[in-house]
Amino acid sequence: MKILIATGNRDKLQEIAQIFSDHEVMGYHEIMEPFEIIEDGESFQANAIIKAKAIHERLSAQDRARYLILSDDSGISVPLLHGEPGIYSARYAGEPLSSKRNLQKLIEEIQKRGAERTPAHYTAAMAMILEGRIYTVHGWMHGEAIIAPRGERGFGYDPMFIPQGENRTLGEMEESEKNAISHRAKALKLARKLLQSLTKTEG
């Protein structure tokens, strides 16, 4: 089964390829011109479905039968900030899009509330389209957001997030350690199990 991922983000592609190591994984831009997808859903799940459907609609009938389409939408939510940045995690600081600016804005917003660390959680929603049908799964990772980032690994908000039961930030962890506990890894593992059950049923 070939898996077509609705992203051009190399970090995401690498993480997905590790989980689906027994499948051929490729970004959608490898078979079509990249295009802008308007993510105007009101939840992570809605945005994941929007992305998957946008790719599906551009495939030929032959390619729709050849590929499983997999998309995700994910982000960090901080209860102290009434759930921000949430679905706006990737564009929290506005244009031009920048992970560093997003990170700094979240730090500043937490600081404004007089906190040095506060509960936070990541959500990952995955949407799969297989033979025209849409399936979704979710994964979560709970922990704390801190205002003093640590570590150079990972991406996004990783240097300021400490997973539950850990003393290190995601930015201080090896990729293999992060992938064992991350919200996206949990959702991907569920997606893999779902794919296995679907292909067995169809077989």
UniProtKB/Swiss-Prot annotation:
InterPro entries: dITP/XTP_pyrophosphatase, ITPase-like_fam, RdgB/HAM1. Its cofactor is Mg(2+). Its EC number is 3.6.1.66. Keywords: Hydrolase, Magnesium, Metal-binding, Nucleotide metabolism, Nucleotide-binding. Transmembrane segments: none annotated. GO terms for biological process: nucleotide metabolic process; purine nucleoside triphosphate catabolic process. Mg(2+) binds at D73. One of its GO terms (molecular function) is nucleotide binding. Disulfide bonds: none annotated. This is dITP/XTP pyrophosphatase. It comes from Wolinella succinogenes (strain ATCC 29543 / DSM 1740 / CCUG 13145 / JCM 31913 / LMG 7466 / NCTC 11488 / FDC 602W) (Vibrio succinogenes).
